[in-house]
A protein has these predicted regions:
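Amphipathic alpha-helical packing segments from all-alpha helical-bundle domains
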Residues: 80-83, 115-140, 150-153, 180-184
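Amphipathic alpha-helical segments used for helix-helix packing
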Residues: 96-121
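Amphipathic C-terminal alpha-helical segment
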Residues: 92, 136, 156-174, 185-194
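N-terminal intrinsically disordered/low-complexity leader segments
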Residues: 1-7, 190-195
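Hydrophobic alpha-helical connector segments
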Residues: 57, 71-100, 151-155
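Short, basic, alpha-helical segments at the C-terminal edge of helix-turn-helix-like DNA-binding modules
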Residues: 60-66
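Helix-turn-helix
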Residues: 11, 15, 19-53, 57
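Hydrophobic alpha-helical segments that form the core
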Residues: 101-110, 146-165, 177-185
């Protein structure tokens, strides 16, 4: 008979978040989840409701942490704050270890089809948060309000592209180059307003 392991729920979900973030959903079996998180198969079923529910709980944890992050809060500091958001995201000295895997939510969207409502709900939360933060800052910063909607979408797309670039390369340099270019573009919007 195997020994049961007690693991604190918060630590278990954090470990699951890191595991799913780095490995994805489909490639993980319950044995690997058990070995790397300390969550027994029994606990996986009875406490978390199975692998998919644990995955969704881990994704919720990621989104909660993102909502509270200083990096996301930097967007509120005008065009310079937005530029720094991108530059910080690609800076390996500023990045959380899991961040080298790109964006957990973007990785999830690439792995799953669009017909899973629980994943779509979390994607909507993520995109809504990004759009609102970018749009609010642009609305407060740009004189020409007709550019806010289009530039908001450019920034959301740039966020996705940067995260894909970070995930795709073992070395940080391509992401850093891209982030710096995005930062320069955002700063130029302020110069356009003054011209």
């Amino acid at each position: 008979m195997s020994r049961s392991r007690k693991v604190e729920a918060g630590a278990a979900v954090s470990a699951a978040m890191s595991l799913f973030w780095s490995k994805g959903y489909a490639s993980l079996g319950t044995r690997q989840i058990e070995e790397e998180t300390g969550i027994t198969r029994f606990t996986l079923q009875t406490t978390y409701g199975g692998k998919m529910k644990l995955f969704l709980t881990a994704l919720d944890r990621y989104l909660d942490l993102l909502d509270q992050s200083e990096m996301l809060a930097s967007i509120d500091a005008g065009l310079e704050g937005i530029a720094q958001f991108f530059e910080t995201r690609a800076d390996p000295t500023q990045m959380h270890e899991d961040g080298c895997q790109g964006c957990f939510l973007l990785n999830t969207l690439i792995e799953f089809s669009a017909d899973i409502p629980e994943v779509n709900k979390r994607a909507t939360r993520y995109f809504t948060t990004l759009r609102q933060k970018f749009a609010t800052t642009l609305e407060d910063t740009l004189i020409d309000k007709t550019k806010v909607a289009a530039r908001t979408e450019v920034l959301v797309s740039a966020t996705l592209g940067l995260n894909a670039m970070i995930r795709a390369h073992e070395q940080p340099q391509p992401g850093v180059v891209m982030a710096n270019a995005i930062g320069d573009m955002v700063r130029s919007w302020g110069e356009d307003e003054q011209a």
